[in-house]
Amino acid sequence: MRALTLLTALLAPGAALACTCMWVGPFTKVALGTDLVVLAEVRSHDRQRMQVTVLEVLRGVERRRVVTVLGGDDGNCRPPVAGFPPGTRWVLALQRRDARVYGLSVCGEFWLEVRGDRAVGRITTPTYGQTLESAPLADVLGWVRSGGVTRLAPRAVTSAGP
């Protein structure tokens, strides 16, 4: 049996390294439990990390204007940074990895894309699926600032893709 497991790992290394976390919930369930929630703009990225400009700290403490956020691949349960193009804005719920770096997880909805004056993602939906929601950005920012006290009323808008 051990030989079969080893053979499988050698022949399919991607499968052996796949993320195994379960989706723990929408933005409204996971965001307030993180170290830092920011409104940010992506400056640049390389293979597995991105530099973001902090436009506003919504929750937590961060004095730097530019921070590093780790992305990843299928093996480390972090999203590929290619999904965050330079120049785009996001509401990011981040976990501190060390004194200088934050991490972003795929194990819940830890980011919302900013599209004009709207925030888009899985905001309140209790199950992971193709449907995304949209809410006024000002309402989402207010919700985070209030510690989840203010009301959010997102609406379903689109499919998340293939």
Give the ranges of each region predicted by the language model.
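Extracellular secreted precursors and ectodomains with disulfide-bonded cysteine-rich loops/domains
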Residues: 17-19, 75, 105
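Structural detector for short beta-strands of small beta-barrel domains
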Residues: 33-55
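Netrin-like (NTR/C345C) domain of secreted extracellular proteins
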Residues: 77-162
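OB-fold (S1/OB) nucleic-acid-binding surfaces
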Residues: 48-71
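N-terminal signal peptide c-region/cleavage motif recognized by signal peptidases
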Residues: 13-15
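Short secondary-structure capping/turn segments at boundaries of alpha-helices and beta-strands
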Residues: 24-28, 39, 78
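Positively charged n-region of N-terminal signal peptides that target proteins for export
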Residues: 1-4
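Short boundary/loop segments of OB/S1/cold-shock single-stranded nucleic-acid-binding domains
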Residues: 19-34
